[in-house]
């Protein structure tokens, strides 16, 4: 094989390089355009596009609810916070049984989420789509999302059935 001398390069390599550069010059602006406009291609968005908005009903004085909302946002959810005067009344109106009560109740698609439920559990619920009212983490266990602690305690996420009975959905 001949070394890349001036004539060999001009005759065999340069024409291919020119075609390659021209093709890239035409393709790159089109590929970059969605990013410049602030949108992300559907293949990149993936499952985040399918996540429903989380509507959270909470007391105006509760700070941990905001931390839980931030946890959800970091995991791809859009969250709307609604301050209510009576959280238990909002919970009852939405349809979550009182015995699973916590500091906030949320609606996520067709489901209710009570308390500091991890985002991964909500995503699993939305993927599996069981016949249920939703998920609950009763009370406010230290170490749950929004209740971060140096001394976390084990807790369960409960799947609340339409009959009001619950079973363990996940252990943390």
Predicted regions and their residues:
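Loop/turn elements at helix/coil->beta-strand transitions in domains of secreted/extracellular proteins
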Residues: 51, 77-78, 131-133
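Stable alpha-helical elements in mature extracytoplasmic
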Residues: 61, 68, 83-86, 118-122
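Thiol/selenol-based redox catalytic cores and closely related redox-interacting motifs
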Residues: 93-172
């Amino acid at each position: 094989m001949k070394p890349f001398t001036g004539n060999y390069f001009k005759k065999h390599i340069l024409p291919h390089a020119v075609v390659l550069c021209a093709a890239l010059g035409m393709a790159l602006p089109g590929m970059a355009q969605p990013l410049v406009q602030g949108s992300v291609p559907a293949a990149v968005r993936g499952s985040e596009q399918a996540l429903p908005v989380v509507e959270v009903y909470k007391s105006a004085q509760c700070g941990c609810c905001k931390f839980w909302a931030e946890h959800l946002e970091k995991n791809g959810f859009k969250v709307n916070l609604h301050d209510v005067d009576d959280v238990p009344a909002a919970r009852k109106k939405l349809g979550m049984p009182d015995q699973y009560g916590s500091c906030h109740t949320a609606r996520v698609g067709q489901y209710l989420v009570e308390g500091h439920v991890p985002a991964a559990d909500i995503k699993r619920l939305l993927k599996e789509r069981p016949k249920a009212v939703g998920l609950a983490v009763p009370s406010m266990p230290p170490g749950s999302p929004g209740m971060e602690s140096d001394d976390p305690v084990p807790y369960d996420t409960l799947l609340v059935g339409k009959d009001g009975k619950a079973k363990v959905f996940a252990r943390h």
